From Swiss-Prot:
Its cofactor is Mg(2+); Mn(2+). NAD(+) binds at residues 74-87, 274-286. The gene is leuB. Mg(2+) binds at D217, D241, D245. Binds 1 Mg(2+) or Mn(2+) ion per subunit. It comes from Thermus thermophilus. It is found in: Cytoplasm. PROSITE patterns: IDH_IMDH. This is 3-isopropylmalate dehydrogenase. Its EC number is 1.1.1.85. The record marks Y139, K185 as: Important for catalysis. It catalyses: (2R,3S)-3-isopropylmalate + NAD(+) = 4-methyl-2-oxopentanoate + CO2 + NADH. Pathway: Amino-acid biosynthesis; L-leucine biosynthesis; L-leucine from 3-methyl-2-oxobutanoate: step 3/4. Its main location: cytoplasm. One of its GO terms (biological process) is L-leucine biosynthetic process.
Length: 345
């Protein structure tokens, strides 16, 4: 169980250390054989090496089985050229590992429905996983360009691109509530027709998982009106970009949202939130997203589904018992982590 740890910038080192405490506790209790090494990344790497994704970090990622990432960026590096910015390091990391599927869970924890912008009765029971295709679609399609008179982009997907992200979604659904909603715009776009047909073909290999199709406009409406009906959503790059951001507001705080990026190389697990330089070093950062990212790592990189659920349950109890400041409580990073560890014991 070899992990490359990239704490990054701002609150990244603090929340990553909280996640590592949880992993170390599990390793001690379960004998996981955890081995990890810390590498500079983002702004911290720029300060040390002059680039955000330096060769020692790149090598560490290549040799690891999973990457646990904190956060990158901050005002200190805002004026740098784009090609050496902390955010470019993140894009380079994903590209180097051919990470084609982004997984973004959005869960409203029991007892915290009041945090959601939705009515409590609508928010109750929400637990949705958005699986977004990361490397194809209109963001990368050619030709693309712009003139004085017009601009153009190309929405393009190959069959293997759709098949592989669909498999990720169906495999995830098998470990959850066994229901996949595939989102497209098949009524007006040929790419949507192709997407739908290909997902259906993949779905035949998963007879235990129910498959439903929705147009993207209907899916957006249902995510707001009745989000608890969703289990796993799979969609293309641009629709996934929009729907995952829409779903991210359902729990009520970015501090609750983990993510995973999966592909051919080393998978990356990271909080959705940014580096929050305004609270860095104050000991008040909410480590929930980082701890849940570690739980996703246990599940998706190492197949330890039961341990991942154990971590999620401990976090849910800690959120009710000692909520952090961004959720209306007063528990600092260390105090909240201690509560999680107590419930894991």
């Amino acid at each position: 169980m070899k992990v490359a740890v990239l704490p990054g910038d701002g609150i990244g080192p603090e929340v990553t250390e909280a996640a590592l405490k949880v992993l170390r506790a599990l390793d001690e209790a379960e004998g996981l054989g955890l081995a990890y090494e810390v590498f500079p990344f983002g702004g911290a790497a720029i300060d040390a090496f002059g680039e955000p994704f330096p060769e020692p970090t790149r090598k560490g990622v290549e040799e690891a089985e999973a990457v646990l990432l904190g956060s990158v960026g901050g005002p200190k590096w805002d004026g740098l050229p784009r090609k050496i910015s902390p955010e470019t390091g993140l894009l380079s990391l994903r590209k180097s590992q051919d990470l084609f599927a982004n997984l973004r869970p959005a869960k409203v924890f029991p007892g915290l429905e009041r945090l959601s912008p939705l009515k409590e009765e609508i928010a109750r029971g929400v637990d949705v996983l958005i699986v977004r295709e990361l490397t194809g679609g209109i963001y990368f399609g050619e030709p693309r360009g712009m003139s004085e008179a017009e601009a153009w982009n190309t929405e393009r997907y190959s069959k293997p691109e759709v098949e592989r992200v669909a498999r990720v979604a169906f495999e995830a659904a098998r470990k959850r509530r066994k229901h996949v909603v595939s989102v497209d715009k098949a009524n007006v776009l040929e790419v949507g027709e192709f997407w739908r047909k290909t997902v259906e073909e993949v779905g035949r290999g998963y007879p235990d998982v129910a498959l439903e199709h929705q147009y993207v406009d209907a899916a957006a409406m249902h995510l707001v009106r009745s989000p608890a009906r969703f289990d796993v959503v799979v969609t293309g790059n641009i629709f996934g970009d929009i729907l995952s951001d829409l779903a991210s507001v359902l729990p009520g705080s970015l501090g609750l949202l983990p993510s995973a990026s999966l592909g051919r190389g080393t998978p990356v697990f990271e909080p959705v939130h940014g580096s929050a330089p305004d609270i860095a070093g104050k000991g008040i950062a909410n480590p929930t997203a980082a701890i849940l990212s570690a739980a996703m790592m246990l599940e998706h990189a190492f197949g330890l589904v039961e341990l991942a659920r154990k971590v999620e349950d401990a976090v849910a109890k800690a959120l009710l018992e000692t909520p952090p400041p961004d959720l209306g409580g007063s528990a600092g990073t260390e105090a909240f982590t201690a509560t999680v560890l107590r419930h894991l014991a």
